[in-house]
Every structure is written in C-alpha cells, then in structure tokens.
Amino acid sequence: MRFVDTERARTLEEAQRVANESGIPPQKFVCVDADGNIGWTVMGRIPRRIGHDGRVPTSWADGSRRWEGWLTPEEYPRIVNPEAGAIWTANARVVDGDMAARIGHGDYDLGARQGQI
C-alpha cells in the first residue's frame, strides 16, 4: 500500500508513479506539484487484459480471455498539463481511444456533472 508515499513525492511524475504502483483498488488520481504541474492518472494496479477490449460483457470460460500480469506505470493512461489548464473528473470519462481501452469503457457518468463544474 504505497499510497502514503505520494506525500513525499517532489514532482507530479513521482506522485503519478507512486499512485500507479499503490496496492489499492483502481480509482482516479488527480494531483498538482509545487511547480503548478497538474495531472490525472489511475491509482492502483491495472491488469493486462488479453483477448477482449472491455466494451461488452464477455465470458472468460474458454480461456481465450485472461489477465496476464499488470500494466507498467509507463503504460497507464495519464493527462499532464492539459491545454485547458484544469482537470476535473466528476465520475465521468476522462480519456478515450487507446487510453480508455486500458481501463475500460463503462460505468461512467454521462458528463452532466462535468458541465456543472
């Protein structure tokens, strides 16, 4: 449970790496460092999924779909210093495309809360 190590991180990059390697269940992680760098990533370990892309429910019974270890911190989706100058999540989808495929496509708010923020 390395999450407590984020308080000793000196840079956004260090904090994101600690968050990625922490032993908690995956959840969104937003951080800012003393230099004003802001970022988003996933805190907790993400399994390397083989044989499916997460867009639809699927059976694991035949063995063609499986978990094969964990993603490395370098493979995690992340946002650093976005052009908008701000980051908010509000339980909504934060990334798309290849980055979304790594963490799944479902169970996100449709964006109304983001609009309110």
Question: Which residue stretches match the model-derived regions?
Answer:
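Accessory structured domains or lobes within enzymes
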Residues: 1-116
